[in-house]
Design a protein with these regions (language model features):
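A catalytic-pocket lid/entrance helix-loop region that shapes and gates access to the active site
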Residues: 120-129, 199-250, 301-306
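Conserved acidic catalytic loop of the alpha/beta-hydrolase fold
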Residues: 153-157, 168-182
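Active-site loop->helix "elbow" adjoining a glycine-rich segment at hydrolase catalytic centers
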Residues: 189-194, 202
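Hydrolases whose catalytic domains are alpha/beta-hydrolase-1, hotdog thioesterase
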Residues: 194-198, 402
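Alpha/beta-hydrolase fold active-site neighborhood
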Residues: 248-391, 430
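Catalytic histidine-centered segment of alpha/beta-hydrolase-like enzymes
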Residues: 421-432
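Alpha/beta-hydrolase fold nucleophile elbow
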Residues: 180-190
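Catalytic-loop region of hydrolases
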Residues: 2-6, 11-138, 252-255, 375-378, ...
Length: 455
């Protein structure tokens, strides 16, 4: 009888949860020109298997009406200063705030208001040239490892837990501290990678999820996704070529072929560009749209005459590259193990997209700056559960297709298309039409009709 009662007790007693998050103690934020913003400190676990705690700074814009919930936002980056971003973008949340608090946090490891920041070089990292042989690849991997080790020595345990999945766990700790059973999540740009990671780890906690101008971190086949991105970029190049004078495509192909044989000088930038670098710099000049495309035509003309200086984005940083050092990205995306891996990818993508090829960050910059990284990729791309509630996404010429590949995985989801250039419609562009649809979706769980467009 005693054994029976004990067994029943085990079956009927709730499994004890992890230690509850403490209630947040809100006070003023150390952010200029954001008097409505309130901040609080939140201790979170460094990792699921660690007893160590780190402190996150959390911020909110309080609801202006009767509060019915909270919405968590990450503006992208993927670096810090999310709280400053919220403080400078309060107006886009006016409708959401009629019934919800808007909450963000400065992410772990980065400069900002949260504790436990890594002491790293967060500046510009030049994209390496594709290595010609295995010896060149090995030298590149060794240099990357040395750069990563220099950062890692400041806090090895934190460095090893900087992936978007760790951010997603931090987001769920914020949800719990807010006392919310389910969360509304806005993931903008790289914030969409964090949102997808959250959806994989905590699908039962998602009430609504909006992704804007994000990459697809949820494919079943990463190689196939790289091919899709190459096609997306080639379509953008196609818009430019249709706009440009007749014969521009033929001239462009001849120019990059010439640069692949012998780099073209850019004396005003004190640089020389090979074909891949020209492809990458041209892609960056495509993104602003037709108002700046004349500059690209002029750059092509000057380079044909032997001076590629007009391709430089600035004299200080004339070569392609990205800021941030890869501390998060190297843990979130696959990396090559050999020079042969790199060569195969380049050959395949150039066949898919002859005008731009592999000259985009996820095929060039990240693989070549993450090869040899001292921490393995702990949060590689993987599909999201199809049991999630319908998502909402939005995108421009540059990123509509990749965002669509995220949301179309979940039945009933919707997309908003902006037929124009730009990036991050809700946050950076503050598109009124998009803001209206997102606000309605988050507060009422009402999705726009299929085929919705915003000017």
């Amino acid at each position: 009888m005693l054994k029976t009662l004990m067994a029943l007790a085990v079956l009927t007693t709730p499994v004890s949860a992890a230690t509850p998050q403490p209630a947040l103690q809100w006070s003023s934020c150390p952010v200029a020109d954001a008097p409505e913003l309130q901040c609080a400190d939140l201790p979170v676990a460094l990792s699921p298997k660690s007893d160590r705690k780190i402190t996150l700074k959390v911020a909110r814009l309080p609801a202006t009406g009767a509060k019915k919930g909270s919405v968590l936002v990450n503006f992208g980056g993927p670096q810090g200063y999310q709280i400053a971003s919220l403080g400078s973008r309060t107006k886009i949340f006016d409708r959401i705030r009629t019934s919800m608090d808007v909450v963000t946090w400065d992410p772990r490891g980065y400069p900002g208001l949260s504790g436990a920041a890594l002491q790293c070089d967060w500046g510009f990292v030049r994209t390496p040239a594709f290595p010609a042989d295995q010896a060149g690849f090995d030298r590149l991997a060794a240099a990357n490892k040395a750069r990563g080790d220099k950062c890692r020595t400041t806090d090895p345990e934190l460095f090893d837990h900087m992936d978007a999945a760790s951010d997603a766990r931090d987001a769920d700790a914020v949800r719990e501290a807010l006392g919310e059973d389910k969360m509304n999540f806005l993931g903008l740009s790289y914030g969409g990678t964090i949102a997808q990671s959250y959806a994989r780890l905590f699908p039962q906690r998602v009430r609504t999820m909006y992704v804007d101008g994000t990459g697809n971190h949820s494919p079943r086949d990463w190689g196939r996704e790289l091919g899709s991105i190459a096609r997306d970029n080639e379509r953008l190049m196609g818009r430019f070529l249709a706009w440009a004078p007749a014969g521009t495509e033929k001239r462009w192909r001849a120019l990059i072929a010439k640069a692949d044989r012998e780099p073209i000088p850019a004396p005003k930038a004190e640089a020389r560009y090979d074909g891949t670098q020209l492809r990458s710099l041209a892609f960056l000049k495509l993104r602003p749209g037709p108002t700046r495309w004349g500059d690209l035509v002029a750059a092509i003309t000057a380079a044909e005459a032997g001076d590629a200086s007009a391709f430089a984005l600035s004299s200080r940083q004339p070569y392609p590259g990205l800021p941030g050092g890869g501390v998060k990205e190297c843990l979130d995306f696959p990396r090559p193990a050999t020079q042969r891996d790199v060569a195969r990818t380049v050959k395949r993508l150039r066949a898919i997209a002859p005008n731009l090829g592999a000259a985009f960050p996820l095929a060039w910059h990240l693989p070549l700056t993450c090869a040899g990284w001292p921490t393995r990729a702990t949060n590689p791309p993987a599909p999201m559960p199809r049991t999630l509630p319908p998502l909402l996404g939005a995108g421009t010429w540059q990123d509509y297709a990749s965002t669509r590949r995220v949301v179309e995985q979940i039945p009933g989801s919707r997309m908003i298309e902006h037929d124009g250039p730009g990036h991050n419609l809700f946050g950076a562009m503050a598109n009124p039409c998009v803001i209206d649809h997102v606000s309605r979706y988050v507060t009422e769980r009402r999705l726009p009709p299929r085929g919705t467009t915003c000017p």
